[in-house]
Amino acid sequence: MHYYRYSNAEVSCWYKYLLFSYNIVFWLAGVVFLGVGLWAWSEKGVLSDLTKVTRLHGIDPVVLVLMVGVVMFTLGFAGCVGALRENICLLKFFCGAIVLIFFLELAVAVLAFLFQDWVRDRFREFFESNIKSYRDDIDLQNLIDSLQKANQCCGAYGPEDWDLNVYFNCSGASYSREKCGVPFSCCVPDPAQKVVNTQCGYDVRIQLKSKWDEFIFTKGCIQALEGWLPRNIYIVAGVFIAISLLQIFGIFLARTLISDIEAVKAGHHF
């Protein structure tokens, strides 16, 4: 004798299409990041010679853009298809990945707070290694220039850090026109100049240190960032909380949809 149980369980269309809409944003953002990253690599000729990435001593910002794009594209695809096809495997992958990213972000934030000296040393090493490669990659160059201009700083701990770069080095072996100078992004802006003077940092470090602050920023970028964080702690905290809430919302939608699908499948087995 066979027994049957009729279940009223059904998959909620509300959660299903809400999760789909949530993930379509991820997917489209991932496509944009990947498109921008591949376009940037194409402009630099990296796509025709991938060894250019490994030859760069610093970090290529495009790599970070592509990594973010791959993660967002993959998660968005898994979430969209998983929701539309009611695929438990893809939904669990999406949910698990979001949970992992959430706890990684939380761990990084806690560790960065507890080990501030270690983070400061790693950032110094990172900044100095990228100073060495300043002229080797246009995207890296623009990133450093933006950082220095936005924070009115120069080098990791000061202008002398630019001695690490072969073009700005003050040694007698250097024949660069930029010898003993700094990038234009270190220069104190002149309100009277409407056009950026890209040569304003030439020969600045030949002069007495006491006169440097008349022409360039003398504060290091590590010190500038350490001062920036307390002033903007509420903004940083607000962004972190907003991202966390979005992730928790995505996890909730995925888990709810998984439960609905499992309930429907369980009802069909009787």
From Swiss-Prot:
Residues 1-17, 83-92, 254-270 are cytoplasmic. It comes from the Eukaryota. PANTHER family: TETRASPANIN, TETRASPANIN-14. Glycans are attached at N169. It comes from Mus musculus. Signal peptide: none annotated. Part of TspanC8 subgroup, composed of 6 members that interact with the transmembrane metalloprotease ADAM10. This interaction is required for ADAM10 exit from the endoplasmic reticulum and for enzymatic maturation and trafficking to the cell surface as well as substrate specificity. Different TspanC8/ADAM10 complexes have distinct substrates. Negatively regulates ADAM10-mediated cleavage of GP6. Promotes ADAM10-mediated cleavage of CDH5. This is Tetraspanin-14. Interacts with ADAM10; the interaction promotes ADAM10 maturation and cell surface expression. InterPro entries: Tetraspanin/Peripherin, Tetraspanin_animals, Tetraspanin_CS, Tetraspanin_EC2_sf. Belongs to the tetraspanin (TM4SF) family. SUPFAM superfamilies: Tetraspanin.
